[in-house]
């Protein structure tokens, strides 16, 4: 009986340590090794905050990265995604498209999909559009620590996905704080355990909420 209890305790401890460690590792690894070395059908700019049509620092960095790899002929089309927050006069997608066109990308090469204020909804929206066009290879321009979750969702919906992390702004690998890594690891765990089962998890949970979620998951 004592041996059984010890084994159960050992298993619980292993789960408590292994699951969060795995999530942290895959999130960190995707950030360090994004794997953008082949061409794609489209570049997707993950939505982020804008103010009266002007991209915020995070969105601007993602747009700059998308423009950079578009200029290097990685893909013939850029897709901007993202709805607006309540009270906004425009959307993340529209602000992104406007910036790209204003900075030299032809209008015909930028598609705006003003849907979703979270990664899952945005992913569904652009995958639906890509399927209509009979294409499935995508490069996601986003923050380094967001790469793993964004890629995972895209692959779950049938895309061949890679990520090109922002090279500037507050969320580069060098500038990001560990709490962003922890938050993304927690959000990834929430997605693979609940999101894949149709239970929607908001991107806008606080770090504290995610920590409580991970604690409940592994206990």
Question: What is each PLM-predicted segment?
Answer:
Residues 13-14, 69, 129, 190:
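Enrichment for repetitive, rod-forming helical segments
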Residues 2-35:
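N-terminal type II signal-anchor transmembrane helix
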Residues 86-92, 147, 184-192, 207-214:
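A general structural signal for short secondary-structure boundary/capping elements
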Residues 199-219:
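Short linear elements at protein peripheries
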Residues 177-204:
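A transmembrane-helix-recognition feature enriched in membrane-embedded lipid enzymes
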Residues 24-182:
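A structural signal for short, hydrophobic/glycine-enriched beta-strand patches
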